[in-house]
Amino acid sequence: MMRPVSSSNVAFCTSGKSSCLNQDTMRGVDQFGLYATQQSKYSHPVTHKNISCQTQETINETHLQTSTSRDLDTKSDLKKKKNLGRSGKRGRPSGTTKSAGYRTSTGRPLGTTKAAGFKTSPGRPLGTTKAAGYKVSPGRPPGSIKALSRLANLGYPSNNAGFSYPTALSRGLHSAVETTLKHPIE
């Protein structure tokens, strides 16, 4: 409720706000006639049931104890169930060895690593290197380049495939120079 404050009120201007609030007159409930006449219509009596605190605490404590012990049992059971048919991350049944021939989950042969670059099969027996002469998946010997075989099919007589274009260009220039030598300009 807003009330104009006069400037002559010294207590409001000089002292703190808490003293001003304490001096303010509060209106009682009796001043509102509407509330007094219809009090029974809007206000309901509040009844509290007496509940003993001891029984609630004992119920809560026993409930907490049983739930935590049950949770621990189920967690340990889940761990046991997870490890029943496997050993570790390999994905092979427990009791078998690597040499039994089980592949890893990625599909590469056992004994190979991801860094070796094997996806399913390397194209040569395991334990051999590229230098051993086994052909890689496209069917050509290791170290060969596709471009060399393509350049060889173009028909340039040069043995050096890297300089085939400049050689052909220089041949054309030499033939033009030779014709001018045979027929000097007069």
From Swiss-Prot:
Region feature Disordered, mapped onto this chain: 60-140
Comp. bias (Polar residues): 60-69, 94-107
Basic residues composition bias: residue spans: 78-92
One Pfam assignment: DUF5568
Residue stretches in coiled coil: none
Domain of life: Eukaryota
Family the UniProt entry places it in: Belongs to the UPF0461 family.
Name the UniProt record assigns to this protein: UPF0461 protein C5orf24 homolog
Protein species of origin: Xenopus tropicalis (Western clawed frog)
